[in-house]
Amino acid sequence: MIIQTPSRIHMGLIDLNGSIGRVDGGIGLALEEPNIKIEGKESDDISIEFDKKLIEKYGEDYIKSVRDRVYNTAIKVLDVIGGEGVDLKILSLFPAHSGLGSGTQLSLAVGKLISKIYNKEMNAYNIAKITGRGGTSGIGIGAFEYGGFLIDGGHSFGKGKDKEDFRPSSASKGVKPAPIIFRHDFDWETILIIPKGEHVYGKKEVDIFKKYCPVPLNEVEKICHLVLMKMMPAVVEKNLDDFGEVINKLQYLGFKKVELSLQSDIVKDLINELHKDVYAGLSSFGPTIYAFGDKKLIVEKANDIFDKYGVYGEIIITKANNVGHKIW
């Protein structure tokens, strides 16, 4: 049995002010590529194998970290469903801490595959609770389960509520995944640009939330206005210019403004250059940039910036995944 999951771009957290009694609220999009693909079958114990090309591409350190995550997820899920073991082979991956949601997709893929193998199927929300994913944004879980363009409703906020302070998903164990409140198929081609930039995670990520939150309420109100009255209608009415204009404006509002300010010069330079002619944003903390518009122009601009800084960067031309994970 094989499972394939999408990646996702995270376009922003709507409310990290919290004065209304809710926080977070994510905006995102599931993508066909890059993806995670895992093959599995029932076994007496747990074994984890990797396609040789992945070891060559990502190196031993990253492969070890993936192996550890896969093993820990498998242990938790097998314990819940009463299974003995599983043989897993990782066929495709994408980098961690790059803004594409690899941690959530990997955990959900392993959990879902094991539950299917043992005919004790669980949905993504059950698996997320077991594995501790989705504590800030529900976009990764929604991308896995449904695909498409997604907005989640965040969490209740305050003493005795879902969340009592500002923190990222990685530090939000035990918090239930945010509900998906809007989902729609997405038709436009998406270009990913992955330059050499800052990778934000762990304690550094927690400290950023502590330092920069709450964000100003007036900026949260602007984000809500743009998302509800321009971005969502643009997706439904297939108006790329309206959608893209919101993407460009979101880079300089709320917590996204913080995320972009902490990125390297090449990332900031790339976004500034792209904004002259097309639509582009930083996915999560980055360094991945997503862009919409003239594909040829986007690729040319990205390569020009790579040349300017003398660095290698990856460009992926992809499209939305409108169905979520696939199993065969």
UniProtKB/Swiss-Prot annotation:
Taxonomic classification: Archaea, Methanobacteriati, Methanobacteriota, Methanomada group, Methanococci
pH dependence: Optimum pH is 4.9.
GO molecular function terms attached to this record: ATP binding; beta-ribofuranosylaminobenzene 5'-phosphate synthase activity
Other noteworthy facts: Lacks any chromogenic cofactor, and the presence of pyridoxal phosphate and the mechanistically related pyruvoyl cofactors has been strictly excluded.
UniProt-listed Pfam families: GHMP_kinases_N
Keywords, in A-Z order: Glycosyltransferase, Magnesium, Transferase
Pathway field: Cofactor biosynthesis; 5,6,7,8-tetrahydromethanopterin biosynthesis
Subunit structure: Homodimer.
Protein name (record): Beta-ribofuranosylphenol 5'-phosphate synthase
Family assignment from sequence similarity: Belongs to the beta-RFA-P synthase family.
Cofactor: Mg(2+)
Glycosyltransferase in keyword set: yes
Catalysis: reaction(s): 5-phospho-alpha-D-ribose 1-diphosphate + 4-hydroxybenzoate + H(+) = 4-(beta-D-ribofuranosyl)phenol 5'-phosphate + CO2 + diphosphate; 4-aminobenzoate + 5-phospho-alpha-D-ribose 1-diphosphate + H(+) = 4-(beta-D-ribofuranosyl)aminobenzene 5'-phosphate + CO2 + diphosphate
Job of this protein: Catalyzes the condensation of 4-hydroxybenzoate (HB) with 5-phospho-alpha-D-ribose 1-diphosphate (PRPP) to produce beta-ribofuranosylphenol 5'-phosphate (beta-RFH-P). Also catalyzes the condensation of 4-aminobenzoate (pABA) with PRPP to produce beta-ribofuranosylaminobenzene 5'-phosphate (beta-RFA-P). Only 4-hydroxybenzoate is known to be biosynthesized by methanogenic archaea, but 4-aminobenzoate can be used as substrate by growing methanogens when it is present in the growth medium.
Superkingdom of this protein's organism: Archaea
InterPro entries: Beta-RFA-P_synthase, GHMP_kinase_N_dom, RFAP_synthase, Ribosomal_Su5_D2-typ_SF, Ribsml_uS5_D2-typ_fold_subgr
Organism this protein belongs to: Methanocaldococcus jannaschii (strain ATCC 43067 / DSM 2661 / JAL-1 / JCM 10045 / NBRC 100440) (Methanococcus jannaschii)
EC number: 2.4.2.54
